[in-house]
Amino acid sequence: LVDFPCFTLSSMLKKTFYSVAVEDTRYVFNGIYLKSTDNKITAVGTDGRRLAKLEREVPNKLPFTKGVIVPHKAIREILKLIESASDGKIGLIENQIYVSVNENALQCKLIDGAYPDYESVIPKESKYKVKLSKDAVQTALRQALIAAEEPIKQIRLTFETNLLRVNSSNPGSTEFSVSIPVAYDGEHLTMAFKGDYLNDVIKSVDDQEILMEFSSSGAPAVFRDPSDVNYTAVIMPMKL
């Protein structure tokens, strides 16, 4: 068993958990992937349409050099266990993850299977980079989601010169549109996203600004936290 700082693991799990699938037939998507190298640990969550990845340095080398997939139900229990503690112990026992804090311990079966090549999903370069105000986007999203059609709740982001338009509609009833000033001088471009996916990624960023990167309306959009260079989120846009 290896000592680990509870706050580090807790924050990593929270910032990637929202991207995990719940009952996907592709079982590897139903958990968070943990992989350690030297004194670093990487946590990844994906459901095949979005992805969240976070890296952190840890004082001790953790036993996940081959990579493990921890089920979402186990993640919930681990978070409860480590939430208010400072340090704990973690290890692998056969095909199970073991976590202990003080007198309490938890042992959970891991998900079998090969995790997808998540690095290949993250664009290496993007044509456009735009800084967004977290508050402005959250406010616009909150309103747009009310008007968006269930169950997909599609939100359209249209980038124009120095302007971002946030649109949603529900055929036959409501339509919503709001404009947010942004520093953008690229081509006129519209992207569509599942509203809840956008909302989740905006909430996951701690900074008051969000860096959004994209190359075209059909290419994956990357979201970064300016205050945390080790955090990356990706959302696949919907077809317009």
Specify the residue positions occupied by each region the protein language model found.
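Structural preference for solvent-exposed beta-strand-turn elements
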Residues: L1-L240
